[in-house]
């Protein structure tokens, strides 16, 4: 995400490289380039101008320490202003109601129904909530069925009334169902609509009046850029929602919507969709997003994702196997499957400082994992436990069974051997000593 903007901003800061101090001339030249980068990223013109004016005022008002280079200072100011532009800090959703009612609204095709399922899963897994999905989209063919399938997939209950064509009535019934059965959160999925469609706008207002939601979220496709911002503004004038959810942010290389929407609409971005998986919904953290835009990574989010997938018993089991030099293809496969649960690889790479930039021209394909899994699953249990018995004929059989080539099998075996050697090194006394001086990372087995 934001790849184009990150690259352009990096080039802009190079204008100050070699400068001894910040002056009105070199700042003006740099910020002119920054403004162009923001406009090319589809940021609202007034927002871009106001942003660069604020950065300029702060940069010229700074007493620069001799140890701080002008370019470094400007990056710091731009970072802080970017974070403020996007809201300054994360804004939580209101879950105080009994039950807490969340109303989802937005355009057709923005991804409301999928987002409703993702939000239910996030609240269930990360907040310990007991959500109920309510299907109020009575217009789109198969909308109710789509939500039902998602509810089944994430193991969350759903309220449907296939006989009723009144979404206001269905919303009331769904909330009554939640109270009767002890669900503490109700997520109301509604039909997509345009702000200029008077009849449908009156309908969503009626649903809001009937449901009395604690939180009304406007779901918008980040890839529509400035159109998303304008639509959000029109909707807010009619509906007065509480926050924005940006979907498809992983596919948005420009970032205009994320950078403009808080200022133009005066409502916070609360969540962002970062992929197709049901787990790919994150709380929006402006500071972390500013880090990523400026190529500084997002280690905090990376560690949080790792902690979510951390299994202490599995880590201890792996630790014992490493210490006994028993690491095999079964363990290798388990580690790959754990990484897959954390999200798509390109997104994970962008969270590590410097790595996202280094790999910007590399095609990071999550499907590569499928090939690795196919190869390992085509091995016999004995071959997985004893990789040393993999001779040429066995490898040819594995390649045929997995639909891959002998070269791919050889490459995987080589990668596995390198991983196992590294694991063996980690059990050595020298490595133990080195690791003992380092703070323990979440998810990493301690070496004894």
List PLM regions with ranges.
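Long amphipathic alpha-helical segments used for membrane anchoring, targeting, substrate engagement
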Residues: 2-19, 288-448
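Residue-level signature of catalytic and energy-coupling elements of molecular machines
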Residues: 16, 42-44, 78, 107, ...
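Short, small-residue-enriched loops and turns at beta-alpha junctions
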Residues: 110, 139-141, 165-167, 192-196, ...
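Conserved phosphate-handling catalytic cores of large alpha/beta enzymes
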Residues: 171-174, 179, 183, 195, ...
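Generic secondary-structure signature for well-ordered alpha-helical cores
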Residues: 40, 57-60, 83, 87, ...
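Primarily NTPase-proximal linker/entry elements flanking Walker-type ATP/GTP-binding cores
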Residues: 8-136, 143-164, 170-190
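Small/polar loops that bind or transfer phosphate-bearing groups
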Residues: 135, 162, 188, 219-220, ...
């Amino acid at each position: 995400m934001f790849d184009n903007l990150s690259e352009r901003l990096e080039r802009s800061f190079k204008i100050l490289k070699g400068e001894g101090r910040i002056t009105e001339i070199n700042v003006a030249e740099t910020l002119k380039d920054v403004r162009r980068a923001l406009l090319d990223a589809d940021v609202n013109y007034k927002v871009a101008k106001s942003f660069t004016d604020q950065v300029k005022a702060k940069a010229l008002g700074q007493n620069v320490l001799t140890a701080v280079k002008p370019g470094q200072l400007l990056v710091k100011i731009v970072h802080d202003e970017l974070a403020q532009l996007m809201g300054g800090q994360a804004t939580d959703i209101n879950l105080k109601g009994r039950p807490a009612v969340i109303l989802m609204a937005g355009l057709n095709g923005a991804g409301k129904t999928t987002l409703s399922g993702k939000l239910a899963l996030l609240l269930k897994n990360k907040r310990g909530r007991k959500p109920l999905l309510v299907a109020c989209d009575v217009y789109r063919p198969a909308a109710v069925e789509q939500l039902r399938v998602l509810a089944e997939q994430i193991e969350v209950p759903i309220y449907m009334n296939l006989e009723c064509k009144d979404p206001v009535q269905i919303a009331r019934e769904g909330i009554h169902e939640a109270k009767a059965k002890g669900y503490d959160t109700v997520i109301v999925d509604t039909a997509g609509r345009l702000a200029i469609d008077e009849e449908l706008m009156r309908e969503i207002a009626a649903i809001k009046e009937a449901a009395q939601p604690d939180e009304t979220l406007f779901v918008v496709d980040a890839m529509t850029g400035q159109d998303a911002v304008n639509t959000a503004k029109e909707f807010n004038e009619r509906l007065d929602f509480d926050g924005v959810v940006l979907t498809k942010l992983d596919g948005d290389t420009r970032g205009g919507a994320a950078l403009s929407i808080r200022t133009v609409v005066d409502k916070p971005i609360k969540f962002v969709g970062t992929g197709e998986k049901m787990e790919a919904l994150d709380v929006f953290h402006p500071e972390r997003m500013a880090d990523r835009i400026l190529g500084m990574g997002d280690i905090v989010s990376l560690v949080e994702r790792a902690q979510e997938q951390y299994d202490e018993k599995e880590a201890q089991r792996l630790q014992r196997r490493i210490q006994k030099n028993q690491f095999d293809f079964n363990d290798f496969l388990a580690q790959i499957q754990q990484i897959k649960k954390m999200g798509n690889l390109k997104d994970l790479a962008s969270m590590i400082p410097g790595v996202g930039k280094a790999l910007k021209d590399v095609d990071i394909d999550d499907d590569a994992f499928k090939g690795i899994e196919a190869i390992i699953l085509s091995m016999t249990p004995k071959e997985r436990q004893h990789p040393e018995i993999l001779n040429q004929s066995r490898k040819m059989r594995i390649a045929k069974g997995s639909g891959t080539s002998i070269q791919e099998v050889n490459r995987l075996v080589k990668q596995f051997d390198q991983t196992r050697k590294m694991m063996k090194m980690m059990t050595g006394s020298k490595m133990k000593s080195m690791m003992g001086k380092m703070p323990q990372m979440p998810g990493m087995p301690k070496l004894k």
